[in-house]
Amino acid sequence: MANAAKTITVEQTASAIRRHHSQRATLIGLKLNKIGRTAELQDTPEVRGMISKVQHLVRIVDEK
C-alpha cells in the first residue's frame, strides 16, 4: 500500500480586509476567503510556508 499523504486542516480566524495584497493572495492559495472557513491541504513545505506568512490570520485545526 502506498504511503498516505499527510494532511493539515487550517481555519481562517481573521479578515483579509486592510491586509497587503500578497497576504490576500496567500489566503486564496490556501483555499480560504471568509472567516470561519476551513480547508484540508497536503502537509508540504510550500503549504507550511504559506501558513507561516499569514499565521496571524489562520490557525491549524488538525494535523493527520
UniProtKB/Swiss-Prot annotation:
GO cellular component: cytosolic large ribosomal subunit
GO biological process terms on file: translation
Key words of the record: Ribonucleoprotein, Ribosomal protein
GO MF terms held by the record: structural constituent of ribosome
Keyword rRNA processing among record annotations: no
Assembly and oligomerization: Part of the 50S ribosomal subunit.
Family of the protein in this entry: Belongs to the universal ribosomal protein uL30 family.
Name used for this protein in its record: Large ribosomal subunit protein uL30
Name of the coding gene: rpmD
